[in-house]
């Protein structure tokens, strides 16, 4: 069955085996469509993630006057309109659940000659946006939010933007990317300096599209007025999606899987460092580069894990992988301590609270703190888990079920389709004990 169902029943399956093709990277897919739309000429995108979030972004650019063809589910052909070619939309632009889409579009639309409104689903409508609208306002943009800084975003066009040297108070690739996109339209130079280095997808891809951009870990700089050249992009497999199979193969005895052509952006792979610190057996094979992004096959074998103190320096490089890491920690001997991860409280759900509560429901001892948790390794029992509509929480507890003494029911799993359509089918084929069902 597809992931667009209401609940899963997860229980022990078999050892995980096989060579698995993980869907395309969500962050790269968003940016590939955006930058191809702004380019001069026609770009072909292969490996595009056919998820709800990325479809929302593609649909928005169609409303902005960009012709996008879909020869197959994982392919898009984008007829770029150039940096000045976007057209005024009719009605609001619906980002769905995509925080990446909304924040990057805020930077792009702030520089257009027309007004626009960005809306999202119930989850996205609760997420903080002032971290983006603040620096854009410093550049001369006018964007209104709700009183509490949440969407919808009302973007007033026709503003003359000027470059700024922005020192970001938060380590956020989305904030950085929004400012850089606005900087393409701004007079002068725009730079972003971060408290910790974040993922550099935008910088790498802008360079692939011909933009002269200087970047290094923690900083980026470009000048306004540049044009983008159409180019073909091969989207790597999504590391955050691969993370669930990396953890599952690491904790289910006798497992060995190969995950093909996974994106290994150095600002994305903190989970690999954390798991290796815990004793995981993960090797990289067949290194290559796709669209400026490093990729490799990952071979993961079962290995007994031990608890560890997760270095805070790794946190920005694994912020989306913590739900999976928490499950790995339950299978480890001893305690695993996470600190410096308060950002998890403002994701699609409060992921610290959701994981701590869910694991306690299954009999695991978890001591929650404002910016992290201590997870005590031990056995996983049975229980009913509320995913709070968060795709990563749902998939994390599907893994937990593979070590359950009984079964784990995971409610509200439809949002898995935002990032990993077909997760349950791929998991079942690899050996997961996982049933998908409609809730009564």
UniProtKB/Swiss-Prot annotation:
Gene Ontology, cellular component aspect: cytoplasm
Gene3D superfamilies in the record: Enolpyruvate transferase domain
Active site residues per record: 320 (proton acceptor)
UniProt pathway annotation: Metabolic intermediate biosynthesis; chorismate biosynthesis; chorismate from D-erythrose 4-phosphate and phosphoenolpyruvate: step 6/7
Record: residues binding phosphoenolpyruvate: 26, 99, 127, 174, 351, 392
PROSITE patterns registered for this protein in UniProt: EPSP_SYNTHASE_1, EPSP_SYNTHASE_2
Enzyme superclass (EC): transferase
Keywords annotated in UniProt: Amino-acid biosynthesis, Aromatic amino acid biosynthesis, Cytoplasm, Transferase
InterPro entries: Enolpyruvate_Tfrase_dom (IPR001986), Enolpyruvate_Tfrase_sf (IPR036968), EPSP_synthase (IPR006264), EPSP_synthase_CS (IPR023193), RNA3'P_cycl/enolpyr_Trfase_a/b (IPR013792)
Gene Ontology molecular function: 3-phosphoshikimate 1-carboxyvinyltransferase activity
CDD domains recorded: EPSP_synthase
EC number: 2.5.1.19
Superkingdom as given in the UniProt entry: Bacteria
Location in the cell: Cytoplasm
GO biological process: amino acid biosynthetic process; aromatic amino acid family biosynthetic process; chorismate biosynthetic process
Residues involved in 3-phosphoshikimate binding: 26-27, 31, 172, 174, 320, 347
Main subcellular location of this protein, as a coarse class: cytoplasm
The reaction(s) this protein catalyses: 3-phosphoshikimate + phosphoenolpyruvate = 5-O-(1-carboxyvinyl)-3-phosphoshikimate + phosphate
Function noted in UniProt: Catalyzes the transfer of the enolpyruvyl moiety of phosphoenolpyruvate (PEP) to the 5-hydroxyl of shikimate-3-phosphate (S3P) to produce enolpyruvyl shikimate-3-phosphate and inorganic phosphate.
Family: Belongs to the EPSP synthase family.
Complex and partners: Monomer.
Protein known as: 3-phosphoshikimate 1-carboxyvinyltransferase
Species for this entry: Xanthomonas oryzae pv. oryzae (strain KACC10331 / KXO85)
Gene encoding the protein: aroA
């Amino acid at each position: 069955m597809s992931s667009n169902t209401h609940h899963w029943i997860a229980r022990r399956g078999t050892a995980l085996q096989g060579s698995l093709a993980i869907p395309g990277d969500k962050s790269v897919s968003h940016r590939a469509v955006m930058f191809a739309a702004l380019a001069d000429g026609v770009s072909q995108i292969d490996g595009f993630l056919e998820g709800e979030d990325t479809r929302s972004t593609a649909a928005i650019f169609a409303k902005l006057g960009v012709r996008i063809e879909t020869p197959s589910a994982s392919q898009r052909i984008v007829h770029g309109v150039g940096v000045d070619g976007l057209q005024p939309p009719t009605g609001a632009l619906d980002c769905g659940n995509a925080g990446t889409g909304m924040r990057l579009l805020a930077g792009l639309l702030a520089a257009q000659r027309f007004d626009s409104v960005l809306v999202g689903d119930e989850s996205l409508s609760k997420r903080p946006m002032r971290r983006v609208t603040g620096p854009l306002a410093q550049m001369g943009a006018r964007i209104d939010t709700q009183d509490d800084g949440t969407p919808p975003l009302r973007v007033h066009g026709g503003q003359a933007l000027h470059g700024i040297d922005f020192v970001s108070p938060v380590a956020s690739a989305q904030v950085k990317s929004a400012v850089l996109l606005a900087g393409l339209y701004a007079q002068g130079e725009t730079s972003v300096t971060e408290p910790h280095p974040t993922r550099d997808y935008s910088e790498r891809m802008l360079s692939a599209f011909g933009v002269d951009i200087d970047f290094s870990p923690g900083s980026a700089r470009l000048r306004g007025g540049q044009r983008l050249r159409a180019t073909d992009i091969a989207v790597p497999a999504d590391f955050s999606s691969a993370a669930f199979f990396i953890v599952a193969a690491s904790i289910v005895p006798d497992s060995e899987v190969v995950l093909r052509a996974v994106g290994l952006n150095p600002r994305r792979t903190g989970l690999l460092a954390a798991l290796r610190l815990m004793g995981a057996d993960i090797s990289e094979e067949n290194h290559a580069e796709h669209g400026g992004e490093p990729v490799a096959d990952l071979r993961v074998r079962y290995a007994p894990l031990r608890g560890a103190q997760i270095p805070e320096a790794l946190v920005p490089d694994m912020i989306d992988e913590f739900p999976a890491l928490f499950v790995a920690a339950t299978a480890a001997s001893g305690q695993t301590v996470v600190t410096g991860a308060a950002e998890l409280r403002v994701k699609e759900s409060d992921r610290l609270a959701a994981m701590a509560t869910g694991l306690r429901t299954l009999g695991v001892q978890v001591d929650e703190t404002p910016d992290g948790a201590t997870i005590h390794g031990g056995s996983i029992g049975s229980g009913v888990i509320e995913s709070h509509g968060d795709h990563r929480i749902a998939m994390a507890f599907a893994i937990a079920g593979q070590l359950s003494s009984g079964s784990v029911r995971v409610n509200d799993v439809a949002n898995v389709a935002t990032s990993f359509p077909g997760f349950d089918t791929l998991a079942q084929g690899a050996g997961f004990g996982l049933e998908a069902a409609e809730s009564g």
